[in-house]
From Swiss-Prot:
Activated by multiple phosphorylations on threonine and serine residues. Serine/threonine kinase that may play a role in mediating the growth-factor and stress induced activation of the transcription factor CREB. ATP binds at residues 73-81, 99, 426-434, 449. It comes from the Eukaryota. This is Ribosomal protein S6 kinase alpha-6. The lineage of its organism: Eukaryota, Metazoa, Chordata, Craniata, Vertebrata. Residues 67-326, 420-677 form the Protein kinase domain. The keyword Ribosomal protein does not apply. Keywords: ATP-binding, Kinase, Magnesium, Metal-binding, Nucleotide-binding, Phosphoprotein, Repeat, Serine/threonine-protein kinase, Transferase. One of its GO terms (biological process) is DNA damage response, signal transduction by p53 class mediator. Its cofactor is Mg(2+). Residues 327-396 form the AGC-kinase C-terminal domain. Forms a complex with either ERK1 or ERK2 in quiescent cells. Transiently dissociates following mitogenic stimulation. GO terms for cellular component: cytoplasm; nucleoplasm.
Length: 740
């Protein structure tokens, strides 16, 4: 047992003052508060740190020389987190995250926290909690070797404005609830729940990390009194130091839920004191755009009396699991990781750090020698070393599934050209060029879109593909290489070519075949629109076949370079189902206009499939003025040629899809419900003939979209750092008692 006297404890003192005002729309009641002085992390009566964990016999000890530094993942005042590769032993080649802390920079309380973090990680084994593989120390530093989680942290995702719909939040909160419950069952209060401490693995599941502020051995009938955690996420009983139990974590879960759903914190004043007073007394303004179930859960988590808080009762987490907000969650499947996460990081190189903050990953990884600590520091960390007992067994029995051959061949600094061989051009645009490429190791063929970042910000396109590319009819993003001026997006190769090419090459084509094609495309567009995504460039050249089968299932919607995601006033993503009170009317109008443009493009495609020529251009030599005049008139022919043989039902659908007024145009949902689509198996099998040469039809189609592109300038897609949310959270250092 190692003991510390009061003289060894650091005490940065402050007072909680009485405030009577209205801040950010929150009314603060004029009630006197007890003035107290306390340390940022006053451990109170907890003066002894038990050392009960030891290195398991027979396991190999680790040291810094066994790990190759690859990249910097994060940095604080006490040290850094590196991406490393194990160089020797049964797990050679395995990637880990290495947390390096400088002993000399750690005050006594911080050393206690670090030892506590190591002890907790040794004890914990849970699918949603980060795993500790090794722990060791040198004279000047402490090392924790942890899981490397390629998805980055939720804070980075939030600051990039990806997520969060209520369905997304429901999934992440459910996994967090299981992780917190596991800690509570071990007598551990987490006490520092915030987006920065929630990581995403390569499949998109969460992993809770950073246990430096957690408190062990707190039973339900006992309380801790230390003032630890990030202020904005603190429960009232932590702020007023009247003692707290595991129930404090459920308040923090509510804060996290509120922030993920709204992009703002529920209690945040102009300074630390005001924030704490708001936590203690301010009334919470409940956003009305949230569902009743979400509002209900927030109210039950934001109970200032911890004994009344959801999860504090004798049933614990079961109270939370039974809440109607989680009614669609299968908790057993969730625990077994059988439910599909709402977001999956782009798959690619095992050491890919695209999801991490470039502020850190751009730095050269260097682990400088640590300054020797004070004389008693080594005694403090006695028993710190650890090797996970399962590390050796796992490495013997299981292949390193997350290590691709490319890592072993090319190492950590592999560039696109190290991994892929460029071949011929596939397509050339204003901001990018698309080429075929071959993986140098597997010889598999892919396509790569090379984007000039000086001409266009690719962030939105990458985020959309990462988020929605798992849909079977949306092109799949395989890898991302960010190399200075250019970004390389590696995708599956569309070997079947353009949809229109394939159709026009067929001598005969029936309504039934056309309806099957339109159904597949419209179903995909409807999925995107329901998620608040508009493509805005659905010309036929962006709809391709994955293979030569001609099967509608192999159709892929490609090129999301001009796609947009619906965002609220705070910059967060939304779905159209709950935006009325959260988005400016002109934004909704613009979104509706863009969605209507997507349907218009599908109408042009349908017209061309049935007629064999385009509706508004007679040939590739038509001028933009002529084409725009015809489009603006809203008139197109539905008589003569194939139209004399085409069903009235198809003509009715076309007239609604090509309606000149976007407000009267069909939505994707309405297209799918139209009888020509809903009863497509009953459509005529009559073979429609082709009269015009395919190259003339394609030329006319290109002229149509060229005219449209000249009519309106494409919007400039600014970096996400310019958004209101990114600016609001730009500091990357929420006021924290941890000071790190």
């Amino acid at each position: 047992m190692i003991s510390f006297g009061p003289a060894q404890e650091s005490s940065l003192k402050m007072e909680v003052q009485s405030v009577s005002s209205e801040v950010n729309g929150h009314q603060i009641m004029d009630e006197p508060m007890e003035e107290e002085s306390y340390t940022h992390c006053d451990e109170g009566a907890y003066k002894e740190i038990p050392i009960t964990h030891h290195v398991k016999e027979g396991c190999e000890k680790a040291d810094p020389s066994q790990f190759e530094l690859l990249k910097v993942l994060g940095q604080g005042s006490f040290g850094k987190v590196f991406l490393v590769r194990k160089l020797m032993g049964p797990d050679a080649g395995q990637l880990y995250a290495m947390k390096v802390l400088k002993k000399a920079s750690l005050k006594v309380r911080d050393r206690v926290r670090t030892k506590m973090e190591r002890d907790i990680l040794v004890e914990v084994n849970h699918p949603f909690i980060v795993k500790l593989h090794y722990a060791f120390q040198t004279e000047g530093k402490l090392y924790l070797i942890l899981d490397f989680l390629r998805g980055g942290d939720v804070f980075t995702r939030l600051s990039k404005e990806v997520m969060f719909t209520e369905e997304d939040v429901k999934f992440y909160l459910a996994e967090l609830a299981l992780a917190l419950d596991h800690l509570h069952n071990l007598g551990i209060v987490y006490r520092d729940l915030k987006p920065e401490n929630i990581l995403l693995d390569e499949a998109g599941h969460i992993k809770l990390t950073d246990f430096g502020l957690s408190k062990e051995s707190v039973d339900q009938d006992k309380k801790a009194y230390s003032f630890c955690g990030t202020v904005e996420y603190m429960a009232p009983e932590v702020v007023n130091r009247r003692g707290h139990t595991q129930s404090a974590d459920w308040w923090s879960l509510g804060v996290l839920m509120f922030e993920m759903l709204t992009g703002t914190l529920p209690f945040q004043g102009k300074d630390r004191n005001e924030t704490m007073n708001m936590i203690l007394k301010a009334k919470l303004g409940m956003p009305q755009f949230l569902s009743l179930e979400a509002q209900g859960l927030l109210r039950m988590l934001f109970k200032r009396n911890p004994s009344n808080r959801l999860g504090a009762g004798p049933d614990g987490v079961e109270e939370i699991k039974r809440h109607t907000f989680f009614s669609t969650i299968d908790w057993n499947k969730l625990y077994r990781r059988e439910l599909q996460p709402p977001f999956k990081p782009a798959s690619g190189k095992p050491d890919d750090t695209f999801c991490f903050d470039p502020e850190f990953t751009a730095k050269t990884p260097k682990d400088s020698p640590g300054i020797p600590p004070s004389a008693n520091a080594h005694q403090l960390f006695k028993g710190f070393s650890f090797v996970a007992p399962v590390s050796l067994e796992e490495s013997k029995s299981a292949p390193l599934v997350n290590i691709l051959p490319i890592v072993q061949v090319h190492g950590s600094s592999a560039q696109f050209s190290d991994v892929y061989e460029l071949k011929e051009d596939i397509g050339v645009g204003s901001y990018s060029i698309c080429k075929r490429c071959i993986h140098r190791v597997t010889a598999m063929e892919f396509a790569v879109k090379i984007i000039d970042k000086s001409k266009r910000d690719p962030s939105e396109e990458i985020e959309i593909l990462m988020r929605y590319g798992q849909h079977p009819n949306i092109i799949t993003l395989k890898d991302v290489y960010d190399e200075g001026r250019f970004v390389y997006l590696v995708t599956e190769l569309m070997k079947g070519g353009e949809l229109l090419d394939k159709i026009l090459r067929q001598k005969f084509f029936s309504e039934r075949e056309a309806s099957a094609v339109l159904y597949t495309i419209t179903k995909t567009v409807d999925y995107l629109h329901c998620q608040g995504v508009v493509h805005r460039d659905l010309k036929p050249s962006n709809i391709l076949y994955m293979d030569d089968s001609g099967n509608p299932d192999s159709i892929r919607i490609c090129d999301f370079g001009f796609a947009k995601q619906l965002r609220g006033d705070n910059g967060l993503l939304l779905t159209p189902c709950y935006t009325a009170n959260f988005v400016a009317p002109e934004v909704l109008m613009r979104q509706g206009y863009d969605a209507a443009c997507d349907i218009w493009s599908l109408g042009v495609l349908l017209y061309t499939m049935l007629a064999g020529y385009t509706p508004f251009a007679n040939g590739p030599n038509d001028t933009p003025e002529e084409i725009l005049l015809r489009i603006g008139s809203g008139k197109f022919s539905l008589s003569g040629g194939n139209w004399d043989s085409v069903s009235d039902s198809s003509k009715d659908l076309l007239s609604h899809m090509l309606h000149v007024d976007p407000h009267h145009r069909y939505t994707a949902e309405q297209v799918l419900k139209h009888s020509w689509i809903a009863c497509r198996d009953q459509n005529p099998h009559f073979q429609l003939t082709r009269h015009e040469a395919p190259h003339l039809v394609k030329g006319a189609m290109a002229a149509t979209y060229s005219a449209l592109n000249h009519k309106t300038c494409k919007p400039v897609l600014e970096p996400v750092a310019a958004s209101s949310l990114a600016q609001r959270r730009n500091m990357k250092k929420l006021t924290s008692t941890d000071m790190s």
